[in-house]
Amino acid sequence: MPLNEIIPVIENLISRGYIKKQSVIDAILSVPRHKFISKSMESYAYVDSPLEIGYGQTISAIHMVGIMCEELDLDEGQNVLEVGTGSGYHAAVVSKIVGESGKVTTIERIPELFENSKKTLSELGYNNVEVVLGDGTKGYLENAPYDRIYVTASGPDVPKALFKQLNDGGILLAPVGAHFQTLMRYTKINGSISEEKLLEVAFVPLIGENGF
């Protein structure tokens, strides 16, 4: 399946103002989304909507990945934590933006998705991504502190462990809520957390000790 099928999607996202930064555009253009889903779903790979990946989980819509990358204000060399690997697609896009001098740690609680995403990311050469099996609501102290943290599932609130593992000056992005969810952006400045509501969203539930 040709990767150039994503070009009209990207053009639409740019025209709607969802994505602006060239680094985000280039990253989404370069990551083969069809490699992160099952063969039976490949024909839908470059449709801008969430897709089932099994185990009650989804691969995020392309526009949502773009929006989150924009709002995280990603840059080369950053240390990033993703909570909820899923297919590994979102981590791949982020890894392209932070580059070889950066690192993405991504945590997945479902063993089958952990194995699948780890295999896909490795085969495609995303060597700056470390996939961890565990409870993402606890974060991952081994690679902390993080310049950026983002959560790909919605919890009742943001686990305190994630704020503790966020660098000063860092940004944390997470959907918050049960049925009605809001994508929130938190910034840590001199140890204090400021928050900003971004938009209404729909994510799968955040499961874990500090989630649902």
Curated annotation (Swiss-Prot):
Coiled-coil ranges (or none): none
The entry's keywords: Cytoplasm, Methyltransferase, S-adenosyl-L-methionine, Transferase
Which reaction does this chain catalyze?
A: [protein]-L-isoaspartate + S-adenosyl-L-methionine = [protein]-L-isoaspartate alpha-methyl ester + S-adenosyl-L-homocysteine
The entry lists its GO molecular-function terms as:
protein-L-isoaspartate (D-aspartate) O-methyltransferase activity
Known EC number: 2.1.1.77
Task: Output the CDD domains linked to this UniProt entry.
Answer: AdoMet_MTases
* Entry GO CC: cytoplasm
Which Pfam family name is an example for this entry?
Answer: PCMT
Its GO biological process annotations read:
methylation; protein modification process; protein repair
Subcellular location(s): the record lists:
Cytoplasm
Query: What general EC class does the enzyme of this chain belong to?
Result: transferase
Chief subcellular site? Answer: cytoplasm
Entries under SUPFAM superfamilies matching the protein: S-adenosyl-L-methionine-dependent methyltransferases
Annotated catalytic residues: S60
Described by its record, this protein's role is as follows:
Catalyzes the methyl esterification of L-isoaspartyl residues in peptides and proteins that result from spontaneous decomposition of normal L-aspartyl and L-asparaginyl residues. It plays a role in the repair and/or degradation of damaged proteins.
Q: Which family does it belong to?
A: Belongs to the methyltransferase superfamily. L-isoaspartyl/D-aspartyl protein methyltransferase family.
The protein's name: Protein-L-isoaspartate O-methyltransferase
Source organism (scientific name)? Methanococcus maripaludis (strain DSM 14266 / JCM 13030 / NBRC 101832 / S2 / LL)
Lineage of the organism: Archaea, Methanobacteriati, Methanobacteriota, Methanomada group, Methanococci
Gene that codes for this?
A: pcm
